[in-house]
């Protein structure tokens, strides 16, 4: 019969005829056959199954073997023995390799045919050993899947006892070696199905023998924690996670995180690879285990691992959001990684450039699942932008993209952040620096945050962008000096010429830090700026003294510094008096003078004092009460003398009698340094010669320029704050003035006027007020509009007699140290004359982001003003200011500078502005500067720099001795150039080493992102270093299996 069958299958007869004859052969199996005939038939059918030329031959072999084995079971039992099966497994069958899946399929079917025979027990024992050997040989996924099918049907073949543990461990290793090289969907689905069969086998073994579970999991961790660069465990290991009981999470994570034998590098690798498991489709609970391990590492304060893993894998996790099968798990892990990474915005900024595209894509498909996902993503994004406020250039597109989705409340955001922090109060978070790459497209260099040094960085960038000041500093010949100015020159040179994206100002920080400033803690940028300018000023004065005492020692350091300051630093000024050669660089650039007048309202005597200033502190004032917004008759107010003006008593014979003409404004304000006594009655006073005042004009009118609260109809402007600053003040109540003529405390009027303007006007908005009820400093979050052009009233003081001849009436100014209620009387004369208005252009703005003075972040907006801006025409003073009421002279809304602001707005908008945010520098616009507080309520302008413009032609001439200054900075000294060249070479070497490290896939590559000079146990700050937005796309993401 075997000969007939063999000839039939190889014949050329039609297929229907062959099938009919095969059917007859199968039916003949019921007849008796001797043992030799049965063995011949079994040999033939085995050969057809394993070596059949086509599917028909293999099909015939299966049908005939099954029929003859069923009717001739003892003969088949004798044929399918241990020796035959062992030979198949170890040597194969003729031309069929032993690892061919057909061998396992044949054995699988053979076991089914002799299941009821006694000899099957011997085969089970044999297979328990052989399957372990096969698994140790790391079979391919398809063979391993067929083996899993066999062992699932015949659990008796699964190794027992100690061999069972070994078998599970080896099977885990085998899964770790699985790879799928195909990219076709059909092959990928088959691969996933094969891996699922193997993982299901392991699950069944774990259930049957629980003692095998823990060793299997240990083997999983050993595979994924391997630091061998030549081996990358397969992501197919993720298929095992869903079979691990969730009840074991706590025990396993504690064991892993506290085991001293587990090195940080191994733990980093393991965690990274577990995050890679998010790419595996159909895997459940991967996100649960990943988050549990992240929390476990945080609990034992292994923050270095968390920082490294987050920065390495945040892009991959975010990219998983594009795929529906793994999106829920990816979002859960992404949320935890971002919300717990609270010491630095670097991780969040890596994904920021890609959020808008993701949102737009999911909004366009319109699926309910996409909408629900976007709601969750929007909440996460709002939490991150709240925590890392101070990056408007990055966040504005995101806010626009998610504006239609609900925004969580501030209370909810705080709760989420508090619950997600690695520790509630951690002192072990490391300040992880940004990856340093080449300069940004702006061509500007950032400053690395050394640990809560954003207050210094923002000020230094503002000073660097003060073009005239920067050029004067760079032009100094300070070789041999070790002064603070030398260090500033070194810093400016690196900011201008380094190839690095960001520079670390460590040396300058240590030299310029005020002694009372605690390192790595939050500080006030305005306080730092004042200290810095004062240090530079006093240092130059000391050098002058040293130079004058050593005239015969040649050009030593002191003389060299003095020569450069006195000869090369020549800033044009119109103020007479002290020559420029006697001024320090700081005085020439930032120095101005204020003249204070105090008039006793009892005897009329006055005192005068002139003080130098480098900045003006502008206080806020609250909205006036409803009662104050009405006209008040002077008859209803306390009065001194109704007719006749009292002549002042001049104590100083060189000073002229002062005629006071109060402006028509009344203010009440309470600020951090200027606290006025509320409720004290306004006093009407006269300190001048008699003049006729019509009754209609003898009324007090609240100025239209009183700043409004945020809820009011108008927005406070810098001009409003200057109005308030320059308004006269009445000293009454507890703030009475001690008059030497009266020898007692008396009511008095205190005014202040600017007599000499600075080249760069620094304005500090006093945003931090002291809350007497709670004894804390609070921040004033009022929005303040910033004019591009500002006109400062300046009254020259070259000669008092000449002033009295030119101006018929003095203009009054207030003190900056005391804020008391003021009652001002309108002018009754037509001879009111305004001081000279000096135009200034906005140069830079330092912004504070935060809600208190003890926390937050500083960044700055700035632009280059080289002194060549002539895009505006000043309104002639004779036309716009002559015979104007004194109220207009105080920069009110009716003053000429308001018109200039409107004319300039569109023209100046197109000029380049830069946003300096620690190491990140980006292009921006003046529109962004104007809208910063309206878009981000915690971000408010704090320190402003205005550059003076010449009235003659709108430009300030450059130093005539330096012709190259016209279009650029002066050439650097050789010492500075050599230092920069050396550092640029070092930078190129660093880039090369980093490239090699990335190529070798070093496990500790991310550690290079942290500075060597800082301790990982230093406390974190809320204004850490930035990462520059990531960029570059998802080039590190591996191929997904879908």
Curated annotation (Swiss-Prot):
Residue numbers annotated as active site: 454, 857
Domain of life per record: Eukaryota
Enzyme class (EC, first level): hydrolase
Keyword Ribonucleoprotein: no
MF annotations from Gene Ontology: cysteine-type deubiquitinase activity; protein sequestering activity
One Pfam family it belongs to: Usp38-like_N
The name this protein goes by in its record: Ubiquitin carboxyl-terminal hydrolase 38
Subcellular location: Cytoplasm; Nucleus
Disrupted-gene phenotype: USP38-deletion mice produce higher levels of IFN-beta, TNF-alpha, and IL-6 than WT mice in response to viral infection. They are also more susceptible to inflammatory damage and death and developed more serious pulmonary fibrosis after bleomycin treatment.
Quaternary structure, from the entry: Interacts with isoform 1 of FBXW7; this interaction prevents FBXW7-mediated degradation of MYC.
Family affiliation: Belongs to the peptidase C19 family.
SUPFAM superfamilies registered for this protein in UniProt: Cysteine proteinases (SSF54001)
The reaction(s) this protein catalyses: Thiol-dependent hydrolysis of ester, thioester, amide, peptide and isopeptide bonds formed by the C-terminal Gly of ubiquitin (a 76-residue protein attached to proteins as an intracellular targeting signal)
DNA-binding keyword on record: no
GO cellular component, one term: cytoplasm
Functional description taken from the UniProt entry: Deubiquitinating enzyme that plays a role in various cellular processes, including DNA repair, cell cycle regulation, and immune response. Plays a role in the inhibition of type I interferon signaling by mediating the 'Lys-33' to 'Lys-48' ubiquitination transition of TBK1 leading to its degradation. Cleaves the ubiquitin chain from the histone demethylase LSD1/KDM1A and prevents it from degradation by the 26S proteasome, thus maintaining LSD1 protein level in cells. Plays a role in the DNA damage response by regulating the deacetylase activity of HDAC1.
Annotated ranges, domain USP: 445-949
Keywords from the named record: Cytoplasm, Hydrolase, Nucleus, Protease, Thiol protease, Ubl conjugation pathway
EC number of the protein: 3.4.19.12
GO biological process, one term: negative regulation of proteasomal ubiquitin-dependent protein catabolic process
Cross-referenced InterPro entries: Papain-like_cys_pep_sf, Peptidase_C19, Peptidase_C19_UCH, USP38, Usp38-like_N, USP_CS, USP_dom
Main location (coarse class): cytoplasm
